[in-house]
Design a protein with these regions (language model features):
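Hydrophobic alpha-helical and helix-loop surface patches within well-folded domains
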Residues: 1, 97, 135-395, 399-402, ...
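A surface-exposed beta-strand-loop module
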Residues: 1-25, 46, 87-89, 437-449
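Hydrophobic residues positioned within well-ordered beta-strands of beta-sheet architectures
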Residues: 4, 57-59, 95, 134, ...
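Solvent-exposed residues in well-ordered beta-strands and their adjoining turns
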Residues: 7-11, 62-64, 100, 197, ...
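Short edge-strand/loop segments of extracellular domains
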Residues: 21-31, 182-185
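Hydrophobic helix-coil surface modules that form long, contiguous segments used
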Residues: 34-39, 46-220, 248-252, 261, ...
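Long, ordered, helix-rich scaffold segments
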Residues: 305, 387, 403, 442-797
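Beta-strand-rich binding/interaction modules
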Residues: 360-361, 371-456
Length: 797
């Protein structure tokens, strides 16, 4: 046995990687926290960075007296001891932590500072004597915004649920949750010391139900990791799905079961799966769920929409295939056999096959080892008002291998018709199993002809669905009559996928959003739709249609001729906002979306821009009853005005002084860098390339200020410089910061000239790092997709 002692001095980080240091501008306090996944523990202490190298860690921290220090385990009894200061007037003390259970290095954690901390405890309902201390912490200057009672109650409810479902006791001796500033991710599952993104989950003003549900989802996602990922850790990063896909799936399930957000799977369908379909549609980013990962640089890019969202959607299909009871029983068996160790795909398949009585390896080969989505279409034949035949067809091509792929789909086909009140209601639910290239749904023959067929109703499987012509016509003309939240979410997903793939025109989608996305739409779905409508308008529409629909996104309601020649209301984004119920979630969602669209109004010319700026001023002046003007909403309005060159530097500075928080400083940086001036664009671009002192949040703010779609005429000239610099940026910055710069400064709303310049760079830089090339290819694919959509042929409706 050998002992190696290392004494070292390290650098604090401002990138969110390693040991990050933050100075609070409000009270001058300093806070530290770690983030190591996948391989940044080496930035703080010398370790072996492999997930299958697990050991017990013990930590001793010397820190200013009065600080609270948290780690993976409880502090040892009497573990805080005062020490004499060395060369200072203030004293220090040392906090010692008990040795942890076996952990890989990336899960070790430390959070230190004068935190505001609220404590509680949880007692297992099924294991007498198992009581775990709980806490929630945030910066002291934000103490008034910590919803401690709500968060502790949610934590207990989640632990109750997982305790019952997994039949394996909570495997750690404490559960601290720390909300931290300048965080790169949503959260991180360090056992016993979970960290959360302050900007996302510490609410400083009014928020929607969807935001609270999203916070609950993240909390329960990380809690699931205490078992999937922490207790049983993937052997290597190609099995990242064994923790992230599971946590994404289980977090959504628990959001509904423990937190009471019964719309959780609707939100999953409209948000998480949209991310999955986008990542899976790009040749540059699609990969099998179980992907080859050669090194830790590649591992960092494995945390994507395939590993998280597609993997979770496929797990939902797995549960539909084998049943929830078998899934949970297999999970508990895996925990028993691999506790505090590692596991691979084969380990999970073995226990699942054992419990379900089915050999799951063929299922896994079809779903986990192939890339790209299945595409399912339906062919409906009607005779004399009744269904003569209904045929489902699936096709799939793995972009990685080039092979044709057929997957087994356990799904539901929903038949919808208009009722007497004009609502689209489901008249028949047809469960089917599609395993071959086609399937005749014999149960449908003879049923009344539907107005709409929704393949994959209830969202049980993962597939891109192409509706038949009758259904597409129904969706574009009457989607607002579809009142079931899940069916409505799936219908919107179908339409957006059709636009993204240039099957239908951008105008059809934006028109549908303006007409049919009413205030009864589930808030998370409404948020997604309004964001998609703006993106489709700015990126996918040809220049003429872009101006027409951008004007509608920011305009008041107006009247125009209907098909019968009678006046009809033409919906506008401003009109929809003014009509939203005061204080409602819909009002908050529409105000945020309208201000984002308003920031692009330079595309409407001087007169149009001035009118939009005047309306943004109305919001700032409180002209919308019920809309609370918290700091966030004020900054949104001021940033929109800055993008329109309709606000002064003095006004922005006055708001910064009124909101002197870290968030306020970051918002001020974004707003002040958003003005449409050529010299300012050059200054911001140069600062992003050369200023290595910028924190991760401040880089994001400057990138957002620089890369405004409506300012493309001011930023187009920077593309050649961008392409000259990115390889040096990749080599000279940490991967987290470099990724933000490479993606954020890419000419995302460019033209054919930009696309060709990027292709030339790829051709002349074949030896550029694989991870860098992947990011460039990903952004190029999005640009090429947008250019194709612009050529589809817009028809202004």
């Amino acid at each position: 046995e050998h002992t190696v002692e290392i004494t070292a001095r390290g650098l604090y980080s401002n990138s969110g990687q390693g040991l990050h240091r933050f100075h609070d501008p409000v009270d001058g306090a300093t806070y530290l926290y770690t983030h190591f996944e996948p391989s940044d523990a080496r930035r703080a202490w010398p370790v072996m960075e492999q997930p299958d190298i697990k050991t017990r860690f013990s930590l001793e921290v010397r820190h200013p007296r009065g600080w609270t220090v948290m780690s993976n385990t409880r502090p040892q009894a009497g573990g805080s001891s005062p020490q004499a200061a060395t060369g200072t007037e203030c004293g220090c003390e040392t906090t010692s932590f008990a040795a942890s259970r076996p952990l890989p290095s990336y899960l070790t954690a430390l959070a230190a500072g004068p935190w505001h901390r609220v404590t509680g405890q949880w007692t297992s309902p099924s294991r007498p004597g198992l009581t775990i201390p709980l806490s929630w912490s945030c910066r002291a200057s934000l103490a008034e915004h910590l919803d401690a009672a709500e968060l502790l109650d949610l934590t207990r409810a989640g632990l109750d649920l997982y305790d019952r479902a997994y039949a394996y006791g909570f495997p750690w001796d404490s559960y601290d949750s720390v909300i931290v500033p300048e965080y790169n991710l949503g959260a991180m599952e360090n056992p016993g010391c979970v960290t959360f993104n302050e900007e996302l989950y510490l609410f400083r003003g009014p928020v929607t139900r969807a935001q609270r549900a999203g916070r609950a989802n993240t909390i329960l996602h990380e809690m699931c990791h205490m078992w999937f990922g922490d207790l049983v850790t993937p052997t290597w990063w190609e099995d990242t799905w064994l923790k992230e896909s599971f946590a994404d799936h289980q977090g959504t399930w628990a959001e509904a079961e423990a937190a009471g957000y019964t719309e959780a799977w609707v939100s999953f369908a409209s948000t998480r799966k949209a991310w999955a379909y986008l990542e899976d549609s790009r040749p540059a980013t699609t990969h099998p769920i179980v992907a080859r990962v050669d090194d830790v640089e590649a591992a960092r890019q494995a945390f994507d929409g395939i590993t998280y969202a597609k993997g979770a959607a496929v797990l939902k299909q797995l549960v539909a295939h084998v049943g929830q009871e078998a899934f949970f029983k297999a999970s508990g068996l895996l925990f028993e056999r691999r506790a505090y160790g590692n596991a691979s795909l084969d380990d999970f398949l073995h226990v699942l096959s054992q419990v379900s009585g089915r050999d799951m390896h063929d299922w896994a080969r079809a779903w986990l080892h192939t890339a790209g989505p299945s595409v399912i279409t339906d062919e409906l034949v009607v005779h004399e008002g009744r269904i003569a035949s209904l045929t489902l067809q699936q096709e799939g091509s793995d972009p990685v291998s080039g092979w044709s792929v057929l997957r087994p789909h356990t799904l539901v086909v929903g038949l919808y018709s208009f009722d007497g009140d004009g609502a689209l209601v489901r008249t028949h639910r047809l469960p089917v199993v599609l395993e071959a290239a086609s399937l005749d749904v014999v149960e449908a023959v003879g049923l009344p002809a539907p107005d709409l067929v929704i393949v994959n109703d209830e969202d049980l499987t993962y597939a891109v669905v192409r509706p038949d012509e009758t259904s597409l016509s129904c969706l574009t003309g009457s989607l607002g009559s579809l009142h079931d939240p899940m069916a409505r979410s799936l219908a919107w997903s179908m339409l957006h996928n059709l636009v993204r793939d240039a099957v239908i025109d951008a105008a059809l989608f934006v028109q549908a959003v303006l007409v049919h996305a009413d205030d009864d739409t589930e808030p998370s779905t409404l948020t997604v739709l309004l964001n998609q409508a703006l993106r489709v308008t700015c990126r996918y529409a040809d220049p003429h249609t872009r101006s027409v629909f951008l004007e509608r996104l920011v305009a008041d309601d107006s009247t125009g001729p209907s098909t019968e020649g009678e006046p009809a209301t033409v919906s506008g984004g401003w009109g929809r906002l003014r009509a939203a119920a005061p204080g409602s979630d819909a009002q908050i969602v529409r105000a945020r979306a309208w201000l984002e669209a308003a920031g692009q109004a330079r595309l409407l010319g001087e007169a149009g821009s001035a009118q939009v700026a005047a309306r943004a001023r109305e919001i700032l002046d409180g002209a919308l009853p019920g809309l609370e003007l918290d700091a966030d909403m004020r900054w949104r309005a001021l940033t929109a005005l800055a993008r329109l060159d309709a606000v002064s530097a003095n006004e922005l500075e006055a708001q910064r002084k009124a909101d002197p928080t870290a968030s306020g400083i970051t918002h001020h940086l974004q707003a002040s860098s958003s003005m449409p001036h050529q010299d300012l664009k050059a200054e911001v671009f140069e600062r992003l390339l050369s200023d290595t002192t910028l924190s991760n949040d401040h880089i994001d703010a400057l990138v957002a200020g620089f890369a405004v779609d409506a300012h493309r005429e001011l930023t187009a000239s920077f593309t050649p410089r961008y392409l000259r610099e990115i390889q040096g940026l990749w080599a000279g910055r940490g991967q987290e910061i470099a990724t933000r710069l490479v993606v954020g400064l890419f000419p995302a709303c460019g033209d054919e000239v930009d696309a060709q310049a990027v292709e030339d760079w790829l051709a002349t830089h074949p030896d550029a790092p694989t991870a860098l090339r992947r990011l460039v290819l990903k952004s190029l694919d999005d640009l090429r997709r947008a250019l194709t959509a612009r050529r589809t042929g817009s028809v202004v409706l």
